Amino acid sequence: MTPRLFALIPCAGTGSRSGSAVPKQYRTLAGRALLHYTLAAFDACSEFAQTLVVLAPDDTHFDARRFAGLRFAVRRCGGASRQASVLNGLLGLAEFGAADHDWVLVHDAARPGITPELIRTLVATLKDDPVGGIVALPVADTLKRVPAGGDAIARTEPRDALWQAQTPQMFRIGMLRDAIQRAQREGHDLTDEASAIEWSGHTPRVVQGSLRNFKVTYPEDFALAEAILARAANAS
């Protein structure tokens, strides 16, 4: 049986570093909620069986009317960490008929620059891979190590083999669920899905990502994201 495709959008974070009064995924950029751009990109990929958005149980900011016309489901099963939210979302996908051998693409709600083309490139590259992988970019900047709490450079780190992880991250549902559960049992709270897969002894692949697919994190990121999204809208 051909594996199906599912998308999972963990959307339970508060965005504390963004300096916003509301969670950043609901901030308006170029006339739309930031989350809208992620949902629209996956909605444009009709090959996906379902896109599941994981909200915090007490989220009072989500308004489905802002995303009218887009195909997705919502479950209020977010946990205390990204890892917990993703695990709860993976378990929730069973409600939509997802099987262990099916693929899931986990994507940050705060990466509005994702495009259907990048999603399809990732899927086409990894659909026959035994493990899966992520979109990522080779590190371009020189990296300096600074001790925690300090402001003095300890050393310069070689960047030759370093890549900056992005999302989506694409893995088999069963493999990813088992990897996260193992990490939790062993007391590890990992910051992305590939880390859990690596922790289980597997080797994910990297697929070239895009600079426009950056994560909106700090206050100054909103203006850059808005400029990119507005330009894309004007070009279409």
Curated annotation (Swiss-Prot):
EC number per UniProt: 2.7.7.60
Pfam families to which the protein is assigned, alphabetical: IspD (PF01128)
The keyword Transferase is annotated on this UniProt entry: yes
Catalysed reactions, semicolon-separated: 2-C-methyl-D-erythritol 4-phosphate + CTP + H(+) = 4-CDP-2-C-methyl-D-erythritol + diphosphate
InterPro entries attached to this UniProt entry: IspD, IspD/TarI, IspD/TarI_cytidylyltransf_bact, ISPD_synthase_CS, Nucleotide-diphossugar_trans
Annotated pathway: Isoprenoid biosynthesis; isopentenyl diphosphate biosynthesis via DXP pathway; isopentenyl diphosphate from 1-deoxy-D-xylulose 5-phosphate: step 2/6
GO molecular function: 2-C-methyl-D-erythritol 4-phosphate cytidylyltransferase activity
GO BP terms in the entry: isopentenyl diphosphate biosynthetic process, methylerythritol 4-phosphate pathway
Site keyed Positions MEP for the nucleophilic attack: positions: 159, 215
Site (Transition state stabilizer): 17, 24
PANTHER family named in the record: 2-C-METHYL-D-ERYTHRITOL 4-PHOSPHATE CYTIDYLYLTRANSFERASE, CHLOROPLASTIC (PTHR32125:SF4)
Name of the molecule in the record: 2-C-methyl-D-erythritol 4-phosphate cytidylyltransferase
